[in-house]
């Protein structure tokens, strides 16, 4: 696919699953800018260091399939198979990913194999995770393929203290990971992920050049593009989908701040909005801190939303010497 935006690519996937002719299975491949995709049943606040994502301009979205959170960048190639429901058994990832493994074996990664519920491994290290979704007698299975991903980012993203947030969402399970590039034959260790993608496609289809399978390329109409853009706007780029779909959870943060004292914040968040707030501590204030707690109730629990709302008040009136900026950091640290 043309886009490097995961939100557009997921919108395209969903649209094609629902509307494309799948008399022949569809195979989609795409490469995207740095992003994190959480599973359908996950809580972004619990899974991720959202401050790190925001500061490093890493896109966040939610997919419609289950599973855990994944990080993609331009060193990753994602792929999707869309088939009739009766052509694939839900959860049979080994069957779905077999063509990918066969192609990788031809390219030199002979130790690559399926393992666990839905992963691909090489020498005991994970390089691909997969998930499935079924609807209207169709199933799509999509997955990542870590070719040359910046692995140093992974631990920075998937780090949130369990003491800070408690919810009933599905947690991600960290696994030791690797990139597949170093396991390929030297002639296939390309500098660009796009070149790896093209070679993998050639191996999958048994051709020497992509021009030989040009007729298999799916062309989108203007109506298709408009429908996909609508999905992008209303779903994958919409905070209500990304955050509002999160299961109810509690946020707890207790810290000591110089010249302020101890500040202990407890929030309940339901459907992405603060439903209850309590602030405790040994700090001083000119106004009852309960007014600050009440001010938070009903607000969207998003950094940008709370930052905008706090422009209406001065936190230091309720918690002496605490700036709006420091209070904001306390709510999202």
Task: For each feature predicted by the language model, list its residue ranges.
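FAD-binding core of FAD-dependent oxidoreductases
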Residues: 63-78, 120-122, 126, 131-139
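Contiguous, small/hydrophobic- and glycine-enriched helical/loop subdomains that border
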Residues: 76-118
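Beta-rich nucleic-acid/ligand-interaction surfaces
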Residues: 114-130, 219-232
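Short beta-strand elements
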Residues: 131-132, 145, 255, 263-281
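Structured beta-strand/loop patches that form or line metal/cofactor-binding pockets in enzymes
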Residues: 223-270
